[in-house]
């Protein structure tokens, strides 16, 4: 019989991983760096589907590196919006594809042009730019949405660390004053229980406590902006539960019951369908990056930049090692 040799380091890591995944308890934490105040006890609660909000907006962002010279980067970011009224999609807005030049002194010029209270000397990267575009789009939705509407956001209700917390608090306060619920859905959550992924633990607990096809929710924490953070399985056929952040003033069970009515699409059970549309609109696939570079290359040519200068500035020399 062939016996596979396992290194000591790998065995130690596997043993530790096994202990974390099967530990069954421990405190809640957010290794992702969120500023959350966790509930003392997390209790699963059954969820019953109601009717979808009459007006639903969804926002998602996209980003891409078009050209990378390491010391300089040409990047693009955008945020897309969609609006559903009584189940009918009435708006698909890809959003403006905004280009930014990053690197060295260029970063300050970019930071100065941003809003959301971002400091002029803030460190700028592509993640911040995408976050900025998304929250600007959410702010527009709050201004345009009708009373009773729900605005869905990809991610959570915590801004990038370079955006002052007061900006998010102000946004959510404006939404609440207009009877608008802002709900953020996180596809990849860093929340943990005893070091193990929290959502996976709750999914297993729910099967034992409520049954394999039960819809459920569980309050978890509050954010520094006052948002209610919960875990929720929003369709009986959903393979996974999600972290959902709900704006202050929203009744969690009522909001989740209404949101679940948006989560019965056969292709994406358990995930709000309007967000899948926004995700598709915001995507920045390879062909888009290539088309954008062709436009930039043409503009550089018109500006008198020689072809060999353009080629050598953005050549991927590491690619030389990956030809074989």
Model-based region annotation:
Residues 1-50, 54, 99-150, 154-324:
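Long, contiguous domain-sized segments
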Residues 54-64:
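Two-metal-ion RNase H-like nuclease active-site motif
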Residues 58, 79, 152:
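Generic enzyme active-site microenvironment
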Residues 64-109:
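Acidic, metal-ligating active-site segments
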